[in-house]
C-alpha cells in the first residue's frame, strides 16, 4: 500500500489510563506502541488524540448515583466508564513510551462536561465537531490511517466519522487493541465493513 503526502497517521488515545495499570486498561494496550513506532516513519503527517475529561464528567459511572462502570446510561444509552483520563492527571498523559517527535497535532476530546467524545471528528452528540475534518481539509489530506486505543470505541468511531466527513479511512488492525464489552469488537467490525473501511496489517504498509 503506497503512502503519500496526502495521508496521515492518527494515533488514538495511547494514554496511561488505557494501558496496563491504568484506570480503564485496554488488554495489552501498550502492545500497540512498538507497532506504531515501526510504521510512523512512513507518514509525513502524524496526529495524536488525547481523551481529556473534566472531573465529574458525564461518562463516568461515579457521576450517576446507583450506576456502575460498564452499565448503560438509561437516558443516553451510552456506556458508563470508570473515572479516567481526568485532565491534568498522570492517567491522562500520553504514555511515556510513545515517542513520536514529528507529531504535528495533539487533539483533545471529551473535555465538555455534558458530552462524551469517542470520535476525533465529532462529539457523541454527532453534531459538535472536534476539528479534525477542518484540519485535514486545510492541509489537503485525503486518507487517514488509524491506530491506538480502543479499537472498538475511539479508533473505530473515528474511522467511521472520517468516512462520514468525506475522507478515506484505513484501520491498522495490529496497531490497535480493543476492550470488547458485550461483543463490541464484532459490532464495530460490522460497522466498519458497511462503511467501506478496510482493516490492514502494519506489514502491508
What spans do the regions from the language model cover?
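Short, well-ordered alpha-helix to beta-strand connector turns
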Residues: 6, 43, 102-103, 166, ...
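Histidine-anchored nucleotide/phosphate-binding helix
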Residues: 36-39, 153-166
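Extreme N-terminal starter segment of soluble prokaryotic enzymes
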Residues: 2-9
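Active-site alpha/beta core segments
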Residues: 34-143
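Active-site flanking residues adjacent to catalytic metal/cofactor-binding acidic residues
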Residues: 12, 50, 173
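Short, flexible loop segments at boundaries between secondary-structure elements
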Residues: 170-185
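Short acidic-hydrophobic, aromatic-tinged amphipathic segments that line or gate anion-handling sites
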Residues: 198-205
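Short glycine-enriched, charge-decorated loop/helix-capping segments at active-site entrances
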Residues: 22-28, 120-124
Amino acid at each position: 500500500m503506497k503512502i503519500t503526502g496526502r495521508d496521515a497517521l492518527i494515533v488514538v488515545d495511547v494514554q496511561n489510563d488505557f494501558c496496563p495499570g491504568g484506570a480503564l486498561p485496554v488488554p495489552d494496550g501498550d502492545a500497540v506502541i512498538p507497532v506504531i513506532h515501526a510504521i510512523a516513519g512512513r507518514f509525513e503527517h502524524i496526529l495524536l488524540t488525547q481523551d481529556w475529561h473534566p472531573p465529574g464528567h458525564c461518562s463516568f459511572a461515579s457521576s450517576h448515583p446507583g450506576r456502575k462502570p460498564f452499565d448503560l446510561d438509561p437516558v443516553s444509552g451510552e456506556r458508563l466508564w470508570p473515572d479516567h483520563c481526568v485532565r491534568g492527571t498522570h492517567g491522562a498523559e500520553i504514555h511515556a513510551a510513545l515517542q513520536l517527535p514529528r507529531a504535528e497535532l495533539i487533539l483533545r476530546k471529551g473535555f465538555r462536561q455534558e458530552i462524551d467524545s469517542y470520535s476525533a471528528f465529532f462529539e457523541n452528540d454527532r453534531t459538535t465537531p472536534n476539528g479534525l475534518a477542518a484540519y485535514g481539509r486545510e492541509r489537503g489530506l485525503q486518507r487517514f490511517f488509524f491506530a491506538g486505543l480502543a479499537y472498538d470505541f475511539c479508533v473505530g468511531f473515528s474511522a467511521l466519522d472520517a468516512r462520514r466527513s468525506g475522507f478515506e479511512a484505513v484501520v491498522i488492525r495490529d496497531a490497535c487493541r480493543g476492550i470488547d464489552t458485550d461483543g463490541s469488537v464484532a459490532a464495530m467490525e460490522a460497522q466498519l465493513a458497511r462503511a467501506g473501511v478496510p482493516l490492514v496489517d502494519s506489514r502491508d504498509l
